[in-house]
Design a protein with these regions (language model features):
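Eukaryote-biased recognition of intrinsically disordered, low-complexity regulatory segments
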Residues: 4-25
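Short strand-turn-strand beta-turns centered on an Asx-Gly dipeptide
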Residues: 11, 28, 73-75
């Protein structure tokens, strides 16, 4: 493989309240086999050697499982490939001489910590508000004691695939967290183990979502288009149904 020349425009921001800017970098020795984040590692090593501050970005597993990474790449959350996280993107997706613009997730509820790293603890607080069950569901053999229809199990599994990366919020013009919250509400509302808190969960998680300052959902579908786990916006409809049902049922 020939080495690629890549020009980067990377967002730099010293802290949440600092003024940010795009900074240009030229890389001349990029292998097409490198992952996108390895390419940033190479740039950071160069910056450190030159005595400059490395670019802050989040990553952990680097195999599309954990939800830690997430970059806005040329205006698209997680980059150009469908159903993938940023860490699953490779430089062979790009051509020699390309310019790539890299920005953080942008949402009031996700303040920039530094450079490309944002604070997603708002998601944790939505989960804490209701994304749990209080009933002990037993050990593995007990799973067969409560029968779940295959169709319901499949829908619950599809919703539970969410890795809380925040791409849905970043891509949405309203910065709505409806797909994330909808996935979490759905996955428990579809299973019998989730039924004791069902009404309270829907109300509390939606209320927390609104309190965090996420925008409202206007059914654009941008979220589903960039979701690395390709979670359906049918989960948003299910959340709305759960919320309405809980509101009418007098839960609190």
């Amino acid at each position: 493989h020939h080495a690629m020349r890549i020009k980067l425009r990377v967002w730099r921001q010293a802290g949440p309240d600092a003024q940010g800017r795009l900074e240009d970098h030229q890389l001349d020795d990029i292998s097409p086999d490198m992952s996108f984040l390895e390419m940033l590692d190479v740039l950071n090593e160069r910056l450190i050697k030159a005595g400059d501050e490395p670019i802050d970005f989040d990553s952990d597993c680097r195999e599309g499982i954990c939800g830690t990474c997430g970059l806005m790449i040329d205006g698209r959350a997680h980059g150009p490939l469908p159903g993938t996280t940023t860490c699953q993107l490779h430089m062979r997706t790009y051509a020699d001489g390309d310019t790539i613009v890299i920005e953080p997730w942008r949402a009031d509820a996700f303040p920039v910590l530094r450079d490309l790293s944002v604070d997603r603890t708002a998601f944790d607080r939505i989960i804490a508000a209701g994304g749990f069950i209080s009933v002990n569901t037993g050990a593995a053999p007990d799973a067969n004691a409560v029968l779940v229809p295959k169709a319901d199990a499949d829908l619950a599994m599809d919703a539970a695939a969410c890795i809380a990366c925040g791409a849905c919020v970043a891509q949405c013009k309203n910065a709505s967290a409806a797909l994330f919250t909808g996935a979490k509400v759905s996955h428990l509302s579809l299973l019998p183990q989730g039924s004791p808190e069902r009404a309270r969960r829907a109300l509390r998680m939606v209320q927390q979502m609104d309190a965090e300052g996420f925008g409202s959902c206007s059914n654009e579908g941008e979220c589903e288009a960039v979701c690395p786990k390709q979670i359906s916006i049918a989960n948003i409809a299910r959340m709305n149904r759960e919320f309405t049902r809980a509101s009418l049922g007098g839960a609190s």
